[in-house]
């Protein structure tokens, strides 16, 4: 069975001291890096996703509700929107960016972009229309199973995993390689993923 690893949103913006920092984010980044170094040969395809917000509309708010609206985070072109240093050092080949001009949680809402440039709305839409999506990339690589890791389990990891399952992939989320915004939201996310047919496991 051909496998892919999706590393979701492991960026300083979601780690301690980031704009939407999650407790344990830096430690998860280091564990993911260790895992990739030990298991890289098992995967036919490895991809990262990033929040890469340019003008995401109401997704950013000065008075966020932390459900549909959020403080400014993942701002394209800033250091905090880049990959976490531990992940950047892995030199992963395929990078997908999402949320440029709207809210986006799932990695399957992203387009492949291996640069850090600021694209126009028209450029983003053109690349979406051209099929430069994560789903198409995985299918082109012959992938049938995906392992999902990253930040945050309760939000973008969950949505990426659920979308992968809906697209017909066998999906595993490694619980020791992700972290939720809160334990309560993590419990709810794990219940939702399990109900959606996603395997929850440890990476070792």
Predicted stretch roles:
Residues 8, 50, 175:
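Active-site flanking residues adjacent to catalytic metal/cofactor-binding acidic residues
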Residues 12, 54, 153, 178-179:
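Short, glycine/acidic-enriched loop or turn micro-motifs at the edges of active sites
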Residues 15-25:
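Acidic/histidine-rich helix-loop elements
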Residues 30-145:
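Active-site alpha/beta core segments
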């Amino acid at each position: 069975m051909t496998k892919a690893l999706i590393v979701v949103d492991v960026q300083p913006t979601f780690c301690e001291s980031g704009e939407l920092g999650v407790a344990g984010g830096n430690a998860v980044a280091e564990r993911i890096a260790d895992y990739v170094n030990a298991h890289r040969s098992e995967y036919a395809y490895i991809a990262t996703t990033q929040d890469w917000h340019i003008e995401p509309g109401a997704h950013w708010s000065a008075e966020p509700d932390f459900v549909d609206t959020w403080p400014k985070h993942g701002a394209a072109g800033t250091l905090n929107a880049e990959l976490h240093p531990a992940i950047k050092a892995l030199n992963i080949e395929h990078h997908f960016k999402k949320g440029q001009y709207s809210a986006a949680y799932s990695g399957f809402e992203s387009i492949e972009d291996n640069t850090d440039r600021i694209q126009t709305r028209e450029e983003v839409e053109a690349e979406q229309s051209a099929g430069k999506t994560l789903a198409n990339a995985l299918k082109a690589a012959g992938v049938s199973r995906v392992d999902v890791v990253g930040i945050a389990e309760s939000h973008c990891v969950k949505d990426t995993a659920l979308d992968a399952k809906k697209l017909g992939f066998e999906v595993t989320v490694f619980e020791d390689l992700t972290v939720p915004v809160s334990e309560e939201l993590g419990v709810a996310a794990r219940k939702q993923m399990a109900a959606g047919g996603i395997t929850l496991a440890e990476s070792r």
